[in-house]
């Protein structure tokens, strides 16, 4: 559930609708700026970020909405996930974000696509302090062009030059 395209009222509505439909796994993410996507002229919303969305989920689970109104019926219960970029240039910044997300209620993490296993292993050595499961993101690039596109347009993903060269050679 990305915060980029919806305000808090819409996000809360999406969460309550998901609960009514029996969807109980929620991956909370801020989302990339619209300039990075295929509609760069669109205005992003970003009323909430991933941490405040996790807080919102916990609030709904307590039986209260963002307006302070009590929910009717049984409050929803979600399995709350968040995103982390283990191959980021700033591992310490990612760990600090991870800590804030855990404090906000994240129960598991999904990584951005990992193309540098050594960096991922080093990250996980530090991230294990949080005691939360981490699911590694895997993308198999179909071409050098796809890998280059991800490097240029997808935040938190870096396909190493060596892999780009291998993909170019595998035409």
Residue ranges and their predicted role:
Residues 1, 26-28, 80-84, 102, ...:
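Hydrophobic faces of well-ordered beta-strands that scaffold small-molecule active sites
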Residues 1-9, 78-93, 167-171:
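Active-site mouth loops of central-metabolism enzymes
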Residues 7-15, 33-54, 60, 64-69, ...:
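Active-site-adjacent beta->alpha loops and helix N-cap segments on the catalytic face
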Residues 23, 77, 131-133:
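A generic structural signal for alpha->beta connector loops
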Residues 31, 44-73, 83-88, 131-171:
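Active-site pocket-lining/capping segments in soluble small-molecule metabolic enzymes
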Residues 96:
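Active-site loop of classical SDR/Rossmann-like NAD(P)-dependent oxidoreductases
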